[in-house]
């Protein structure tokens, strides 16, 4: 907002014309005029040619179990076609699980620690559950927040910038969600992936020695 960016969430695009977008939200229809329009509509699975297999569908893709097995014997699926997470790093891990299962190696796919990154300036990254999801599910949780400006390294490298580290924990004090706004969020999010995958607790994170000075120190400091 400080940079003049305006967000319209929970909205549906109805029509696009030269220099104009018509969209609707809970309050009705609206129009936005602009000299440029960037269309980012995502992807959808290509299922052409596999109709004869009669695979059980899931959303717009193919249903798989935690071993990436489909409803048909000796058929596995991985990547965007599973309709879980349309991200390259998710597809890589799904492919590993599928191949390991084919070879009889015990492996299982988990989706509780899939990182997502917006490569903007400043960067935004998140891993695990969000506070909104926990509220909707009625689960007990605790929020830990700290401004990125508590990190001297962040202040030195992002002059005049600000950011936020937000960590969510469950009633067992396990890390279940971690979210960053500010550079270098895309690099720091790997720490969140490890913490959530390993089901680390607040006490365990606090015992980790982070190098100083680094922006990643903010993770431990947020939990102090």
Q: Where are the regions that the model predicts?
A:
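N-terminal glycine-rich dinucleotide-binding loop that anchors FAD/FMN and/or NAD(P) in oxidoreductases
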Residues: 1-11, 126-133
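General small-molecule cofactor/ligand-binding pocket signal
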Residues: 6-8, 76, 142-144
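A conserved short coil-to-beta-strand element within the FAD-binding core of flavoproteins
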Residues: 9-20
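Glycine-centered tight beta-turn/hairpin loop motif at sheet-sheet or coil-to-beta transitions
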Residues: 26-29
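FAD-site-proximal beta/loop scaffold in flavoenzymes
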Residues: 31-103
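Short beta-strand and adjoining strand-loop segment in the mid-core
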Residues: 81-87, 117-124
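Internal hydrophobic alpha-helix adjacent to the cofactor/substrate pocket in enzyme cavities
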Residues: 89-112, 140, 198-199
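Flexible, glycine-rich terminal cap/loop adjacent to redox cofactors
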Residues: 103, 120-130, 135-224
């Amino acid at each position: 907002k400080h940079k003049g960016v305006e967000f319209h969430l929970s909205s549906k695009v109805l029509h696009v014309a030269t220099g104009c977008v018509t969209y609707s939200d809970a309050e009705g229809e609206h129009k936005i005029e602009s000299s440029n329009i960037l269309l980012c509509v995502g992807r959808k699975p290509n299922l052409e040619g596999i109709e004869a297999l009669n695979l059980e569908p899931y959303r717009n893709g193919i249903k798989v179990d935690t071993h990436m097995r489909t409803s048909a014997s000796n058929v596995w699926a991985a990547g965007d076609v599973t309709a879980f997470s349309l991200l390259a790093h998710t597809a890589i891990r799904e492919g590993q699980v599928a191949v390991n299962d084919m070879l009889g190696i015990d492996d299982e796919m988990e989706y509780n620690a899939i990182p997502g990154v917006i490569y903007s300036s400043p960067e935004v990254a998140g891993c695990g559950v969000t506070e909104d999801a926990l509220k909707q599910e009625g689960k007990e949780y605790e929020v830990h927040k700290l401004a990125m400006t508590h990190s001297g390294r962040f202040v030195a490298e992002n002059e005049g910038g600000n950011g936020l580290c937000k960590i969510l924990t469950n009633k067992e004090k396990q890390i279940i969600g971690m979210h960053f706004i500010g550079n270098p969020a895309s690099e720091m999010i790997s720490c969140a992936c490890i913490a959530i995958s390993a089901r680390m607790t607040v006490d365990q994170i606090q015992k980790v020695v982070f190098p100083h000075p680094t922006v990643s120190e903010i993770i431990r400091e947020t939990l102090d």
